[in-house]
Amino acid sequence: MSSWRKIYYKLLNLPLKILVKSKLIPTDPITELRLDTTRPILYVLPYHSKADLLALRQQCLEQDLPDPLNLLEIGDTELPSYVFIDNGPRVFRYCAPKQESVKIFHAYLDLHRNNPNLDIQLLPVSVMFGRSPGREGQNAPHLRLLNGIQKFFAILWLGRDSFVRFSNTVSLRYMATEHGTDKTIAHKLARVARMHYSRQRLAAVGPRLPVRQELFNKLLASKAIEKAVSDEARTKKISHEKARQNAINMMEEIAANFSYETVRLSGRVLGWTWNRLYQGINVHNAERIRRLAQDGHELVYAPCHRSHMDYLLLSYVLYHQGLVPPHIAAGINLNFWPAGPIFRRLGAFFIRRTFKGNKLYATIFREYLGELFARGYSVEYFMEGGRSRTGRLLDPKTGTLSMTLQALLRGESRPITIIPIYIGYEHVMEVATYAKELRGATKEKEGFFQMIRGLRKLRNLGQGYVNFGEPIPLIQYLNNHVPSWRDSIDPIEFHRPEWFNPTVNQLSEKIMVNINNTAAANAINLCSTALLASRQRALTREQLLEQLDCYIQLMRNAPYATDVTVPKKTAEELLEHALQMDKFEVDKDSMGDIIILPRDRAVLMTYYRNNIQHLLVLPSLIACIVIHHRRISREALLSQVAIIYPLLKAELFMRYSKTELPEVVNTLINELTRQCLICNKEHGMLVLNPARIRPLQLLAAGIRETLQRYAITLSLLNANPVISRGVLEKESRMLAQRLSVLHGINAPEFFDKAVFTTSVNTLREEGYISDSGNAITANTQELYQVLGELMSPEIRLTIESVSLPPEHNDTEESAREG
């Protein structure tokens, strides 16, 4: 580089260093994009901009990537390390690639023709200052193609809202070998790069935002809403104008009022907030979502719902991953001042808890959601309908998912893909409130003063986790499950086909399973699992470290799913981090430390344990069977797991099918054997290892309460085979509450209504309850026999004494009196 050019770049870099603070996407490009720093890199930028080049250079130097201002020396040839595809501020879609970029591409391709060992990486990079999509009807916003003056003001105003995004590399060796090295290939390469940047820009910025009143006018003109308004006027005996005004009021209540400036400013505030409240936000698998957005998919984000923080955290993460924040379905309870107006400008649209008896509202909401899809906006909704109070996934509510499929059946929207998302925390600010509600306290209404009280609790929140699960493309899903689904497409009116409801239910289950497939284990939920497994909720430091190591090795060596994230830290490091969170106490004496989970916090910590219970429930079941039988064959153990597994699968949204189960169980047995928790004797007999009995017992305790709940329901069914479903669920809960008092079981989900409902439904599906509602006693007795052998005698005695038939209890009482 000539000396005058160096001076020029240094002078230009001085104000940029002050004004520009770019965020890198992805945050670790070398690892996430698998960049080979030993091979030469040619940086490809969309258009000529020295400011963009220097912003790129700053990030390259920070990431130990080659300096784009240095020339690439290949043999006797020197070529620039960067290339601009376009050369100026003109309308992007109509400008052809400039000859200079084609010339540089051709020079590099020619080098590959003459040097068979050469393999240069093309690294596409885009630099964005601001991401406002603009409003419909306005002139094009200043997104990318800016002249010098426009660029100066963009940097001045948006320099701290800039992004440098790296894409996957392209091998020039592959291009040269597969497509040749002549000038037409260089032209094609430049043209493909231009298309890549155009798609990437749309994925990052999104479609233009609607003018709110024009959107309402379009909705009011739809045939479905016109009919609903007429029906409203007729059934309520009001004027058509009054019914129409009701419809407008409902639209005002529902519709978002998305504002880029609010998103940008809130991003600054939230960034400051997260840095002070959280020790880190861990994001996994975001690249797969960026790829889908760039390929033109309509994205529906379906996260689990742990906290009110979920809304803000996910939008913040998506924005900083180079994606458009979605329109979010939020409960109407959050539409209070000042949160409601702010959420609305951040993309929230509000939904009532029930549509029952309000056809006009249901129609307007369905049409509004369909319009969002038709315009290409990403959407977010919580499948569970509300925040989980137990830390487990709730049964999915399918209303909004049904409307999503209805939008697809209009035939108007782009390909819709659902993104299951696991959101996890080391501290949930509402967890104490959840515990009170599960004990029967009335749910507090959200409002300004409650929000202020909540903000006061925001401190020392540890780590946060946002894991993007395996996407579910709806068209592909329907092609596989309902090949004739296209016959039901109707752009005017939705007619519910026979396959619709069963398919929605199956799809909702798959979404929940995929959420669990991407769970995040962390220091808090692992320590909580171990301490809650101890009878006295206390372990020595050595015992706790041993147990943490057991869990970590299980998750690493016999992973539940490939997307599950397991801490890279050692057990010692995890424990130190957990102790810093002030959730556990340490009792020190001359013999060492004892880690204690105080009784008043135990019920709160079950929430965190339940976040990952599905990851450890099968190894826990295997450990439980081995402990209670002491000696058992693999075949017998597998048989017992197979008979219990359907109940676990339904309750915890587990991923394994019945056919996959034997291989999974064998893998887990091998891992437990490798850890010396159990021993594999001759003839395939499995026995416990006395030297490692404690970690095996703690592992087994993880499923203890779950098996007791199943035994309660089975015992009641055996005692009264004709018991009605409602009475069975009610008496199961009552018996569970009694058992929890008598035996000190301090877990809110132990007598949760939804858990027993799921269990009873599964028993019916698995053939334990007939279509007429009566128990099939041969089956229920067989299952209860298996469960009974896995419980302590005192627990079994309590269950059986309470669930005996009334006449049996009378006889026993008379015998005692006599």
UniProtKB/Swiss-Prot annotation:
SUPFAM superfamilies: Glycerol-3-phosphate (1)-acyltransferase. Signal peptide: none annotated. It is a peripheral membrane protein. Keywords: Acyltransferase, Cell inner membrane, Cell membrane, Lipid biosynthesis, Lipid metabolism, Membrane, Phospholipid biosynthesis, Phospholipid metabolism, Transferase. Pathway: Phospholipid metabolism; CDP-diacylglycerol biosynthesis; CDP-diacylglycerol from sn-glycerol 3-phosphate: step 1/3. A motif (HXXXXD motif) lies at residues 305-310. It catalyses: sn-glycerol 3-phosphate + an acyl-CoA = a 1-acyl-sn-glycero-3-phosphate + CoA. The keyword Ion transport does not apply. SMART domains: PlsC (SM00563). Disulfide bonds: none annotated. One of its GO terms (biological process) is CDP-diacylglycerol biosynthetic process. Its EC number is 2.3.1.15. Belongs to the GPAT/DAPAT family. This is Glycerol-3-phosphate acyltransferase.
